[in-house]
Amino acid sequence: MAREVKIGYQNYTIKNLDSIVSKCNEINGQFLASDRIIALSSTEDNISHANTLIHEVLHAIIYQWGIDLDDKEEEKICNTIANGLTTVLVDNPWLLPYIQKNLKGEK
């Protein structure tokens, strides 16, 4: 799955999170700022997997733009926004293509 996502001026590699590590630590994703990695569990279903990616990207945005939050506060914000955004995108399948079209400057 080795892909990259550019956030701010940094590129972050998206990698598979080992399923044993994921299960032992009860996590589906991990943002590793110093390694420039977003690690995702390969055991999640599609919607949950997308939600986890959004969640970890939000952690990267908070880090990259230097937003000063304690860990508990940051986790709550990432969970809330990721869950809300995932729900909006699932419930409105036309929305993401519409946004992409407008970002490309297409009519």
Roles of regions detected by a PLM:
Residues 51-63:
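Active-site recognition of the HExxH zinc-binding catalytic motif
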Residues 1-48, 64-107:
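Metalloprotease/metallohydrolase-associated module, dominated by Zn2+-dependent proteases
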